[in-house]
Swiss-Prot record:
Family of this protein: Belongs to the G-protein coupled receptor 1 family. Opsin subfamily.
Protein name from the UniProt record: RPE-retinal G protein-coupled receptor
Organism of this sequence: Homo sapiens (Human)
Pfam families named among the record's database cross-references: 7tm_1 (PF00001)
Gene: RGR
Membrane topology: Multi-pass membrane protein
Length: 291
């Protein structure tokens, strides 16, 4: 599939086109919403706070996922992977870094909100910066391991995008999967659920809770859970027994996460919405220039 435009096994012409169009819509929606979020942080002084730095980290990670989806969409519409084996490794690495950073940034936001609402103390800049650096360095570390031999990047069933190779299900993949999943999926999910549950217990009855305490955990579980199930199945059974089309479903679901996150963390936040509106408003920009 990387060298020719022949249809991949298990896919028809319309199915390849449909996957490409879905990826394109997901990429453009996620990229546009998260770019607006990033732009509002850069242009609105009120948003330059330690807590909002964590949201900015998430928006950057989700923008990276959307860019990865855009490359996959373009390749799907071309019906081939035009960037060679090195491009496949780079695409897999970039997608894995941003996916892990998105998951861990969501957990960091949950912890930051718990700190803000339940301890009634402001998150310090050095704590927020250290947390963001840890998220990205940790994500880069885990994403680099398949390039070094623990795990491996390869083409997805459609052959027009690259991800962690789960087709063999051997000891190398199994050991990497369980170790990586514990630190980058199970722990962030636990932190997210615990943080919002404690917030709900402490502030839910008082009516002072101003954030959605269920959507973030559901997004992590439903957005990335299908990948976890697919990978787990590859460990315990022959993954080729699953149709190639069904194997592509987790990738399509995961590419929706940036849009959902932008709606929840940015458009669902009154201050961020105001910042986006100020950036888009010609009158506001004119006032800023005359100050």
């Amino acid at each position: 599939m990387a060298e020719t435009s022949a249809l991949p096994t298990g896919f028809g012409e319309l199915e390849v086109l449909a996957v490409g169009m879905v990826l394109l819509v997901e990429a453009l929606s996620g990229l546009s919403l998260n770019t607006l979020t990033i732009f509002s942080f850069c242009k609105t002084p009120e948003l330059r706070t330690p807590c909002h730095l964590l949201v900015l980290s998430l928006a950057l990670a989700d923008s990276g996922i959307s860019l990865n989806a855009l490359v996959a969409a373009t390749s799907s519409l071309l019906r081939r992977w035009p960037y060679g084996s090195d491009g496949c490794q780079a695409h897999g690495f970039q997608g894995f870094v941003t996916a892990l950073a998105s998951i861990c940034s969501s957990a960091a936001i949950a912890w930051g909100r718990y700190h803000h609402y339940c301890t009634r103390s402001q998150l310090a800049w050095n704590s927020a910066v250290s947390l963001v650096l840890f998220v990205w360095l940790s994500s880069a570390f885990w994403a680099a391991l398949p390039l070094l031999g623990w795990g491996h990047y390869d083409y997805e069933p459609l052959g027009t995008c690259c991800t962690l190779d789960y087709s063999k299900g051997d000891r190398n993949f199994t050991s990497f999967l369980f170790t990586m999943s514990f630190f980058n999926f199970a722990m962030p999910l636990f932190i997210t659920i615990t943080s919002y549950s404690l917030m709900e217990q402490k502030l839910g009855k008082s009516g002072h809770l101003q954030v959605n305490t269920t959507l973030p955990a559901r997004t992590l579980l439903l957005g990335w859970g299908p990948y976890a199930i697919l990978y787990l199945y590859a460990v315990i059974a022959d993954v080729t027994s699953i149709s190639p089309k069904l194997q592509m479903v987790p990738a399509l679901i995961a590419k929706m996460v940036p849009t959902i996150n932008a709606i929840n963390y940015a458009l669902g936040n009154e201050m961020v919405c105001r910042g986006i509106w100020q950036c888009l408003s010609p009158q506001k920009r004119e006032k800023d220039r005359t100050k």
